[in-house]
Amino acid sequence: MQPSHFSPTSTDAHRFTQALAVGAAPDGTEDAQATYQFRTLWLSDIHLGTRDCKAEALLDLLRHCHAGTIYLVGDIIDGWQLRKGWYWPQAHNDVAQKMLRKARKGCRVVFIPGNHDEFARDFHGLHFGGIEVLSDAVHVTADGARLWIVHGDWFDGVVMHAKWLAHLGDALYIFTLTLNRWLNQARHRLGFSYWSLSQYLKGKVKNAVSYISSFEQLLAEEAARRQCEGVVCGHIHRAELRKIDGSIYANCGDWVESLTALVELQDGTLQLLMWKPSASAPVVLAELPPGSASTGQAEAPTQPQASHVPCAS
């Protein structure tokens, strides 16, 4: 399956380069040390340019983590919402600056656009401030596993064939997030913890559960067809790391609600992390040890070990 051709408008292209250009200057923070060192870091569905993007939490992760390669797996910039009205607060600016600074300091940063930043797909093969733009990619882990990296919207029939319905669904999702924000403000005042209305609805609606299962199966099958041992994707805002019919299926989650990332340790171990800025360490939600591409299943997660290294962020 190949992406549909998209010709960005001049406004789209201007906003894309403008969003990257705002990070041209240093972000004003100098991190003496990074707490965690990873071989690879995957992030998706950040949705910069929206009010529900948790940019401050992401910035905290970027300050504490160093990786040799960072893959931005789509929907990094929310072009759909920016077309409706420009929203770009300082925290979103800081995230862009941090990414560009990492690229300048030698980190390989690869941007794989999704449907919300599809305007960038015509820039395939180009570099902006050291950030490489690709439609998809193949990553080879330390233990030799080939992972196909793609946002995932190519496998969403609504996005590909009924874009008006996709935009309607996005509007309903934004409305749900707004309700969720108000609800959790009230819960916080009453002393209750965070609760996700959108995740609750996804789990209760039969069609949503069926859609997620089909999406995951299709991605795993396509990765195998491409002679890869697994796939890393985003799009559905559902963090996951497991085996499907022998193939690794990894979904980075999002930075709207779940605050999750996929990482590869130096030995090829894959971990799905949930980042909590106030916590002493990220929560490891799932883990696949080296060699899992051929034999293993997800194991009980272990906490990542803090490794103080010179920060290249």
Language model feature labels by segment:
Residues Q2-L20, A34-R39, T50-A142:
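Core catalytic region of metal-dependent phosphoesterases/phosphodiesterases
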Residues Q2-T17, V133, Y200-E229, A239, ...:
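Non-catalytic terminal accessory segments
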Residues T40-W42, I70-L72, W148, V232:
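Residue-level marker for buried hydrophobic side chains located in beta-strands
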Residues L48, I77-D78, W154, R238:
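Short active-site segment of divalent metal-dependent hydrolases/proteases
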Residues G129-D136, W148, D153, G157-H167, ...:
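Conserved beta-sheet core of the metallophosphoesterase superfamily
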Residues V140-D143, A239, K243-S313:
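Binuclear metal-dependent phosphoesterase catalytic core
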Residues G152-F215:
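Active-site-proximal loop/helix segment associated with metal-binding centers of metalloenzymes
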